[in-house]
């Protein structure tokens, strides 16, 4: 509502959408009321399908999205058609495979594996007495560094004393 009232355009990166496990968390910005008039969603295969480095994704710009009275969708289509020749064919085919039943099953297994690792790390760090959060809807864990250490000091501590790159 704030974006629409101010005329702002909100960009949402949805690379981790496949990791969302909570029922009350939207999988797309467009599940939010009014978002089609003020939001652009960026989707990537890098996080859900392990396509990091292959550069395959897509941008959703609703036809309802206007900026200063100008529809952004046709401007983006024109810009994209002029400046970008498309992903290599083999990468497009890999992206297509993501949507097959086998691809979906493999994605689910990979995501489950990453989320299970996050859960083990979270549990282990909590049991070691650290203040941690995360591991829900994304495979990342946030840790409060102990004793006022900076992140670099803690990185060095882990590397030198525990042989972990953290």
Label the predicted regions.
Residues 16-18, 134-140, 159-166:
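Conserved PLP cofactor-binding pocket of PLP-dependent enzymes
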Residues 39, 130, 164:
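Short, conserved active-site loop motifs that form the nucleotide-linked donor/cofactor pocket
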Residues 96, 111-122, 132-145, 151:
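Conserved glycine-rich beta-strand-loop-beta hairpin in the small C-terminal domain of fold type I
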Residues 1-10:
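Single conserved hydrophobic/aromatic residue that forms the stacking wall/gate
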Residues 31-112, 119-123:
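Conserved core segment of the aminotransferase class I/II
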Residues 14-16, 44-45:
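Short strand-turn motif at the edge of the Rossmann-like AdoMet-binding core
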Residues 21-23:
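Conserved catalytic-core motifs of eukaryotic protein kinase domains, centered on the activation segment
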